[in-house]
């Protein structure tokens, strides 16, 4: 009886491991195909592959933003009314209100800053 249950357990374990391996391989293939698509869309200069980190980050961010824009279009979210001028005017109004808290008063010669507090001079 124990032999039957241990063989079933082994079979189940092998099946589970093979399923996990196949899923991880399929996800790795999707990542590689997406990277190949990005590199094909923006070919590298020469054979040196001298694409900088910032350029690669820019490519990935633009692809991410494009995906988010497509998702928003699919969900039919209304776009913000008004143009960039309205947003700029809102930002200016918020900035012109002045600081909410008064700046910290300190003695004229006291400019020392230690950790998170000003030192007493």
From Swiss-Prot:
Cellular component aspect of the GO annotation: extracellular space
Keyword Transit peptide: no
Signal peptide positions on this chain: 1-24
Propeptide residue span(s): 25-105
Membrane-crossing segments per the record: none
Record's keyword terms, sorted: Cleavage on pair of basic residues, Disulfide bond, Hormone, Secreted, Signal
GO biological process: regulation of cell migration
Positions of the UniProt region annotated as Disordered: 76-99
Disulfide bonds: 110-121
Superkingdom in the source lineage: Eukaryota
Compartments in which it is found: Secreted
Keyword Signal tagged: yes
Pfam family for this entry, one: Somatostatin
InterPro entries (alphabetical): Somatostatin, Somatostatin/Cortistatin_C
Sections of the chain in a coiled coil: none
Single GO MF annotation: hormone activity
Main function: Somatostatin inhibits the release of somatotropin.
Family under the similarity heading: Belongs to the somatostatin family.
Identification of the protein by name: Somatostatin-1
Organism: Lophius americanus (American angler)
